Amino acid sequence: MKRPNVLNLTCPAIPVVRIGFVGLGNRGILALERYMHLEGIEVKALCDLRKENIERAEHILREFGRPEAENYSEEGMWRKMCECKEIDLIYICTDWLTHTDIAVYALQQGRHVALEVPAAMSVADCWRLVDTAEETRRHCMMLENCCYDAFALTTLNMVQQGVLGEITHAEGAYIHDLRKHYFADEKAGGYHNHWIKLYSQQHTGNPYPTHGLGPVCQWMNIHRGDRMEYLVSMSSRQAGLSAYAGQVFGASSEEAAQSYEMGDVNTTLIHTAKGRTILLQYDVTTPRPYSRHQTVCGTKGFMQKYPVPCLLLDEYGKEPLSGEQFERMMEQYKHPFTAVIGEEARRKNMPNEMNYIMDYRLIHCLRNGLPLDQDVYDAAEWSCITELSERSVRQGSVPVEIPDFTRGNWKER
């Protein structure tokens, strides 16, 4: 018997979404602060191994006049939190390697799940998420905020309305100079003696693909009429962190002697079933300007956010639009999420508009019994690139097949 899929999954509406937060470090505490500005939510539980993180979270609840939440601060207590029937949504902001275990258990207890990026670090764990979401008929959304970037949403709107013609190629990336963070204390937001640094010492490929890939997959309707079939990945040698450590701490320092498997720059090429291509890059250890590329090529036009926003349309000639003409097109095709929810974020002086839109949309869909903007197949498809890119790199950049997590149902969209 064929397993029912969860494409366009709807669940009963939840008038007030009761949330349990697990992982209250830097990213988790920021998420909790954002949720203080949303209507229709109640924070029921807080879970973290560090009591000081729990105390910070409790202070935030008091500051915003929210009811006191149950706290879970002992090893393994996240399971007990997931079992609580007074919680509708488990919001996961732990380290990368524990995302899947917590998400799977929460789904099995009947909870909906929102989990930080990447959702999983292996293909096997991607399948666990998909299988469990299908078995339990519960939402599992990876919190890919870059899909709610204003330029990305405008691009999506233009693609869906055919302004750029037939899409043939797109590019995404996570390029962010984080060298100083690799040697800074965790309390200062750094990765020294931290699981992120350890991962870079043991792995290669692209460990953080979803910021660049998420918007691209939405532009290309991945698993909604097309799918990613295979990839080829290549990494440069590692030099950036070693050179930085030598300059800052000295050539004979312990920091400069540390070794890393992760190359400075990873480039992955992806081929889709419809013959389209995706270029995906990862670089956090060279002195480059921040970029996610956000590039899309079509038969009628071209858009790119970085290094500067660019829109070229065939009907307007061979030069990119500029000045009032560019602004007029961007305003004309501004996505409703940006126009309405983004404007609300600005009125509330929220520091990050795309995070606010992401949070708002998740809660709005749960409260109204609607399908989520990102489903478990998105989470699996975008996250599986972590293992598959490493596999390709270690085998001399051979092509590696990308699983069809929808089991053929992508053709029906």
UniProtKB/Swiss-Prot annotation:
Q: What is its EC number?
A: 3.2.1.-
Q: Which residues bind NAD(+)?
A: 26-27, 48, 96-99, 116-117, 145, 191-195, 208
Q: Where does substrate bind?
A: Y174, Y208, P209, T210, H211, Y290
Keywords, A to Z, come to:
Glycosidase, Hydrolase, NAD
Q: What does this protein do?
A: Glycosidase.
- The protein's name in its UniProt record: Glycosyl hydrolase family 109 protein 2
What species does this protein belong to? Phocaeicola vulgatus (strain ATCC 8482 / DSM 1447 / JCM 5826 / CCUG 4940 / NBRC 14291 / NCTC 11154)
Q: Which family does it belong to?
A: Belongs to the Gfo/Idh/MocA family. Glycosyl hydrolase 109 subfamily.
Cofactor(s) of this protein = NAD(+)
